From Swiss-Prot:
Repeat positions for PPR: 119-153, 154-184, 185-219, 220-254, 255-285, 286-321, 322-356, 357-387
Organism: Arabidopsis thaliana
Alphabetic keyword roster: Repeat
Record GO biological process: RNA modification
GO molecular function, one term: RNA binding
Family recorded in the similarity comment: Belongs to the PPR family. PCMP-E subfamily.
Name of the protein this chain belongs to: Pentatricopeptide repeat-containing protein At2g37320
InterPro entries named in the record: E_motif, Pentatricopeptide_rpt, PPR_At4g14850-like_plant, TPR-like_helical_dom_sf
One Pfam family of this chain: PPR
Annotated segments matching region Type E(+) motif: 468-498
UniProt KW Repeat keyword: yes
Region ranges (Type E motif): 392-467
Amino acid sequence: MSCLRNYYCRAFGYKQSRSCYSRSLNREIANESSEVERRARSLRVLDIISSKSGGVSNRQDHFGFVQEFRQTDSWRFRGQAISEDFDLSRTKNGVSSVLEEVMLEDSSSSVKRDGWSFDAYGLSSAVRSCGLNRDFRTGSGFHCLALKGGFISDVYLGSSLVVLYRDSGEVENAYKVFEEMPERNVVSWTAMISGFAQEWRVDICLKLYSKMRKSTSDPNDYTFTALLSACTGSGALGQGRSVHCQTLHMGLKSYLHISNSLISMYCKCGDLKDAFRIFDQFSNKDVVSWNSMIAGYAQHGLAMQAIELFELMMPKSGTKPDAITYLGVLSSCRHAGLVKEGRKFFNLMAEHGLKPELNHYSCLVDLLGRFGLLQEALELIENMPMKPNSVIWGSLLFSCRVHGDVWTGIRAAEERLMLEPDCAATHVQLANLYASVGYWKEAATVRKLMKDKGLKTNPGCSWIEINNYVFMFKAEDGSNCRMLEIVHVLHCLIDHMEFL
């Protein structure tokens, strides 16, 4: 098997090697019983993870392609006119042939040449099509065309480019395009706000909204959905309330997606009373409304309320639960330790024609593990119809630490490291587990691997809202200039919890 693994390494690289060797390990695991076999398996796992390099991100800076183009001037155009119904149906293996049809090297730039032409509206349509097809490289090529043709000042084309870079995860580059736009419309403003909302940068979102209100563009319902998303992600209740007031002022109370966003925001920020008030008052609830409220109860450990709402869902509204609904109710059972109910809802999915997905299995594994049913959790993982991910193994590892099952914990840590070889926390946990059973050599090997890879555990961050501003801080970190206020608010919260 080692020869076969080495062959895969040479011929195809790391991923196939891991897949081939992992299948061999899984077959051998079933027959492991003796101390010698356990130690041998540990050595094999360490051999695998030590040979793995960290995964290199495939994320590209597509805007860099445009910056390179700005420094050179060697593009020309040919091809059929780009029209409003343009699409990327002619793509091959994810690399578009469109640019090859539209651009050649070393010739003069002309927006109309030999009977072929394009305009800003056509380019805008082409950029949108690139975004829909996730072909961001080609989209940046059309950005170059816009620069070459002098169309970059067009508001519709600029908005399409902002959306393109936002969807590619390059929010800062989207903002560069946005800043260069001489004119902006509601699409460009909303796209920029939603981009920063995805990163939970609520302060920037609100500043952009303030600038938008001073411009000629009026916000629409999607603008407020983006703002509420930012408040939801960062837990900014005060700012979320301000956005809520703005939606009422703008007459958007009856919009379903606004109501759903408000329910999610209030639930995430801990104000379940206001969340349920909006939920209860809205007559045209959809499955998202029910899911948001059930998930809110689950998040705050109110399992019985979540289950009661779930059981009312179909009789009261006729709304059929979906996979996300079951994820919410299973999560509520997990937090409350309701093993019997968790098994029931997991099996109930089949009655609604739903197949459990990875997240559902993860919830049930965590529920069983928290209750100390570690062998049942392990059997569930081994019998899953899909390959377990690192989250599931991490959940089992945590439960093993709590309940003192060292050997199952070692198995979970080893499996997780094979999936995430650069996870510093798992390295530390595995080293500690090896040490607890006297595997000193293996523990030293794991710590050496950490040192060689330069892995360090990252401290967790916390957020707190003071006077409508959200501040981030870390344990034993006094660098925040508002630390005294943060500590004061924390002490007030602790006193309040002790009083309850």
